[in-house]
């Protein structure tokens, strides 16, 4: 366990006086650590330091094993609910033929229908670097073909040797 996530319990708590709260919400007030330990022991539970920075530190009387299990369960649930967004990248060039554009747009539409985000990239070679507007124009041309099924997340943007545009599936 890392230092940040380490929880002090029972005899590991160094404070002389603590503000003690019971598992059921009972407030015992400010008591000595030893007295709080006796209360916890009497109930068959652990004394857990929950707010070490407070003056005096706050301790809660609880079943630590059960508490840790519930925390891990919550973390697993949160991890399950996270949705990983997949971004597909489609590379184009300024001198691409219309048929090739149609082919790549067809694939982009399939990705968008699957719920994936699509990043269009135009690579600027050699002298094309002096006219990045041509790359922006290419992406505007592509946008006209995909705007029925997509929302534009990012306008065409020049980033180094690339002109990028990010589109996401249309909502609804």
From Swiss-Prot:
GO molecular function: ribosome binding; translation initiation factor activity
Location (main, coarse): cytoplasm
Subcellular location: Cytoplasm
Classification via Pfam families: IF3_C, IF3_N
A GO biological-process term: ribosome disassembly
Any one GO CC term of the record: cytosol
Keywords, sorted A to Z: Cytoplasm, Initiation factor, Protein biosynthesis
Presence of the UniProt keyword Cytoplasm in the record: yes
Self-association state and partner proteins as the record states: Monomer.
Role: IF-3 binds to the 30S ribosomal subunit and shifts the equilibrium between 70S ribosomes and their 50S and 30S subunits in favor of the free subunits, thus enhancing the availability of 30S subunits on which protein synthesis initiation begins.
Family affiliation: Belongs to the IF-3 family.
Name recorded for this polypeptide: Translation initiation factor IF-3
Source species of the chain: Campylobacter curvus (strain 525.92)
């Amino acid at each position: 366990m890392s230092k940040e996530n380490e929880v002090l319990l029972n005899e590991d708590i160094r404070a002389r006086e603590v503000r003690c709260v019971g598992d059921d919400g009972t407030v015992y007030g400010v008591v000595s650590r030893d007295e709080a330990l006796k209360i916890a022991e009497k109930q068959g539970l652990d004394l857990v330091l929950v707010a070490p920075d407070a003056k005096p530190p706050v301790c809660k009387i609880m079943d630590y094993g059960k508490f840790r299990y519930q925390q891990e369960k919550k973390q697993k649930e949160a991890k399950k609910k996270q949705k990983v967004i997949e971004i597909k990248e489609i590379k184009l060039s300024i001198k691409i033929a219309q048929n090739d554009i149609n082919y790549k747009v067809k694939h982009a539409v399939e990705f968008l229908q699957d719920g994936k985000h699509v990043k269009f990239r135009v690579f600027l070679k050699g002298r094309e670097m002096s006219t990045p507007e041509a790359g922006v124009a290419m992406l505007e041309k592509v946008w006209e073909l995909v705007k029925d099924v997509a929302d534009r997340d990012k306008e065409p943007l020049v980033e180094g040797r690339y002109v990028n545009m990010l589109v996401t599936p249309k909502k609804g």
